[in-house]
Amino acid sequence: SWVLGFQQQPYYGYGTAGSIPSEVEGEAIYIEQYRRYIYRTLFGGIYYPTSRFQRFELGLEGTLVDEDVLEYFQPYELASGFPTDVLRSRTVDVASYSYAMPTLAWVFDNALYGYVGPFLGRRSRFEVGQSIGTWQFFQGTADYRRYDKVAGPVVLATRLFYFGRRGRDAELFQFYGGTTELVRGHTYGSYEKNECLVGGALNACAVNNLIGSQSAVGNVELRWPLWNSVLAGLPLPFAGLETAVFFDAGLVWDNDSNIKWNRDEDDPFIDPSQFDPALGGPEVRNVVRSWGASLRGNLLGFLPLRLDYSRPLGRPMVKHY
């Protein structure tokens, strides 16, 4: 079998902000800049099954990237701070980049599924790719999952996961590793509200600990069904209910990061040399951990839903999330 497709994805990042003098006396202009990358990708692939449960995948993608800066101008009165004109904007073209990347993957899947997920078997995917063109980097993925019955309907689900990029331009593709699909209890919002208001510039916000170009994650879950004869008699719109307790651990780092299991109080979240070369030393990345409980259900037989309650470890300012 084969696949062929096209996708376009915009990515936005904060730029600079500040005020500049205006030609009108008593006024200034407040400027905000946002950096935007638009990825346009044409991709294709061939799937070659070698058995009922495993296959090889050969893919090729070509990507064109347009980089520009979005600028917003707001004139305002110096004395009062009130706007004196409508907000205006412009787009400044910066550069264009292009690269192609062939990929090769081996996939195995013999898992048996229930209403809300697998309950027996294993799944794995190992993939490598090398970009060719303006941006050059090596990309690798390793995802291994097991589902083992412990006793009766109780299932132990485990996962080991790695994704990363290395090479000359790998640092251009940084990502955030605190999503609910990787390490629960460490979403971006939980840091922004609690831990980005303390420390100086060299300490930065703790959210930087989960930003990088490589990630390694381990998840352990103990799952069991809640659907029984009592619940079956209630008019609930769920085809199945399942609960679980879990433990997550993960690490996100860059090519030059200093990796630790536990962080010291004075370890920097960002490279201090970008403020003062004399400070030297890379940023420190440490393993983040969390535990919690989860409730899952299949709404109307076709829409799986999940509710997680997690307690991040090593974050005294956040008790649960």
Question: Model regions: which residues?
Answer:
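C-terminal outer-membrane beta-barrel translocator/porin domains of Gram-negative envelope proteins
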Residues: 5-11, 16-35, 42-45, 64, ...
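Surface-exposed, low-complexity/disordered segments
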Residues: 34-37, 41, 48-55, 60
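Charge-patterned, long linear interaction tracts outside catalytic cores
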Residues: 54-56, 64-69
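Membrane-spanning beta-strand positions in outer-membrane beta-barrel proteins
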Residues: 55-59, 155-157, 304
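Conserved active-site loop/cleft motifs that coordinate metal ions or position small ligands
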Residues: 244-246, 303-310
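Short glycine-rich, acidic/polar surface loops and turns
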Residues: 290-296
